Each structure stands twice: as structure tokens, then as C-alpha cells.
Amino acid sequence: MAELKRTLGLWGAAGIGIGAIIGTGIFVLIGVASGIAGPAVIVSFLIAGLTALLTGLSTAELSSFITESGGSYIYTTKAFGRLPGFVVGWMKSFDYIVGASAVSIGFAAYFTYFAGIPSAVGTLVLVGSAWPLILMVLNLRGMKEASGTNNVLVALKIAALVLFILVGGFYLFTRGDFSNYHPFFPRGISGAFSGASIIFFAFIGFNTIAVIAEEVKEPEKNVPRAVLIAFAICTLLYIGVSVVSVGLLNWQVLGLSSAPLEAALRVATGNFLILEFIALSALFATTSVIMSSIIGGSRALFAMARQRVIPGVFAHVSRAGIPFATVLITGIAIGAIVFLTNGNLDWLASIFNFGTLVTFFFINASLLQLRRTMPDAPRRFRVPLYPFTPVLGVASCLFLSFYLSPNAIVVGFGWVAIGLVAYAVNRRRSRVPPEPAP
């Protein structure tokens, strides 16, 4: 069986997770959610963070005794069998590709702005298609090189968010005017929950650490720790940013801004360098998300190919110790989707939300099942308050599914149907023998 090289330590793995979590969401969604929840967007971040933490804890336990690449695909396969595992892997792989395609367009918009290039559709598509290919080439050099670049980008965007919190917070508390926090619930508690349903998707990405478990040293110890470290850092940054943002700028104004962090910080400082660095951090954020998506998407496909639920040719490992074929496919697919859709990804992006909830549902359900079928497996981490934690994780996914648009549900199930046809064709061709029931 082809194996990947273990090159990542604890902080390298955590960096991959932080890179996948902190994307353009915090730079844009803070405004959208503030317009819905008002100052209670702070509560929205807490609700969304706690909801995502349920799945994060389940991921941490599963990764402590299942150390193969594949993450949610491997967990679901071991818990429920090959077909449910394929559905989860199919959705998650496409999530990586579609999510990165949307982020690539975001990168192109920021890049053309800073480069002083007119942001015509053709220019955005060209830049958005080319950038994933450049990052793909970097990934082909090896995980160590890709992780090193990612860690630099992660450090820069963390520095930008910390700078925002410090500068904005200092101004806010020295001024002593907290009127923007009142009324705290202008849309009621329902507004806070509606805001949380949007913000929730800014917390996903920690599962990428589990997907690359096979490339982490001492994965049974380092992967669960990396998941929790990444989650804790991102949650603290998100809550800090939300507290400062709504304190500096009226929530209604914040909700109408296309660049809410920059708009809020202009209240606290007119320093050109600080404002430009905060704005530039969107370039760091988008690049690290694309980088992490290529890493995660390629490893998810690799894990499926190694078990031959997709053609085994995609399980090839290069001399650099990386899944060469699936890195190529993932990078090219990201660029191709941007190009073929002419940058119009709204209808495809709906699959992302659907696929995320499917994946999180099965992560929590897999923990419940594997506690029953593999009770003696050595676990370096155990979910607290079991079984309530994974049960609440399952329930939260079902609850959030009611907030999905009809388009997301139709397109999502349509993509599952396409996957099932592909699965049946590949199984017939490869003649995979039936497996025993789990």
C-alpha cells in the first residue's frame, strides 16, 4: 500500500488547520452577520464556535486512533462501510475544490485592487485560474515546502487580526464610549441564531488536519492536539475581532460595508501602513486557504484511490512523498472551475454548505458507532461528556440543515447522485469484492 511521508510536527499540522479555517470569511462575514444579529454577532460567534467545537472534539478523538489519511472519509468507512464512506469522501473532496475556486476569485479581486489593474471579469478569471496552478506546483515539491509556505502566510494573517484587535481595542477602551453595543439584541435572540448559521461556515477547516494525519509525526498524539489548538486560536481571534468591530462601528453601517474590518479600523486610526496591512491580509488569507484546500482535497482523493473506490491510479506517491496525481487533479480542477464558470460560482458554492453538514454529521455519527464497535481501540484523547457531545453534534447538523437554501439541497443531492453512478461504474470495472457489514 502506498504511504505518505511523515514530515509535519504539532505546529505544522496546526498551521495547516488555521490556514484552512481563517479565510475571507472573517473579512466579509463579520459585516453580513452584524447586519443580521446587530451587536449580538458576538453571541453568534460563540454559538457558531460551540457548534463547530462539537464536531472538532469528535474529530480529535477519532484522529487519536485512526491515523490514516482521509479524515471523515476513513472514519465513515470504518464505521458504516464503503458506500457511506464514499459519499462523504465524494462530497468533501468536491468541497475542497469548490471552496478553493470561490476563494480564488476573492484572491483575484484583492490582487487586481492592490496591483492597480482594472477588475474586469476576464482579468479576475485569468488571475483566479492561474493562482491555484502556481500553488499546485509548490505543493508538488513536497509537504515540507508547502507547509513552510503556509505557516508564513498563517503567521501574517494572525498578525493582522491581532493588530486589528489591539489597535481597535485600545482606541475603544481609551475613548470609553460603548454606545454601539446598545441595544445588544436589536433583532432578538433569533437574530443571533441566524447570524450563527452564517458564521458557522467560517469555522470549518479543522478537519483538514485529520485528512493529512498520515503525514504527521506521532499522529495519535499530535493530530488531536493540532485540531484543538487550531480551533482555540481561531475562535479567540474571531471573538476578539467581533467585539472590537461592533464596538467601533454601528452594526447597521458595518452590515452595509464590503470591507467591514477596514471600515471599522478607520474609526480608530488613519495610519496608512496599518490599514494597508489589514487589507493585504486578505491576500494572505485567500492564498493559505487555497494552499490548504489543495493539500486536503488531494489527500482525500488519495485515501479513496488507495481503497479503490475511485481508480487506483490516483494512489501514486512521488519520490517527494506526496500524492502526485491527486495534487495535479485538485489544483487543475480548482483553476478549471474558475475558468469554465467564468468566475460565477454562486450555484456551485451551495454544494459547499451541503457537503460540510453531511461531513460533520457523519464525523459525529462515526464516533458514536466506533465507540460501540471498537471500544478497546487505544485513544489518546476522549470526547468529554460522551455521548452527549457527539449526539449534540449530530443534532446541530440537522438543525443547521434547515437553514440551507432549496438550491443547496437540490444541487447537493444531485452531486451525490452523480457520485453514486460513478461509484457503481468504478466498482463494476475494478470488481471490488463486497465487504462484510461493519
Positions of the model-derived regions?
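Hydrophobic, membrane-embedded alpha-helices of multi-pass small-molecule transporters
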Residues: L8-F27, W131-I134, G168-Y171, F184-V244, ...
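TM-loop-TM module centered on a large, flexible mid-protein loop between adjacent transmembrane helices
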Residues: I74-Y75, T112-P118, F184, G195, ...
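Membrane-interface loop-to-helix entry segments
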Residues: G122-T174, P186, V227-F231, A349-F362, ...
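C-terminal membrane-solvent junction of multi-pass transporters and transport-like membrane proteins
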Residues: P186, V313-F324, F360-A408, R429-P438
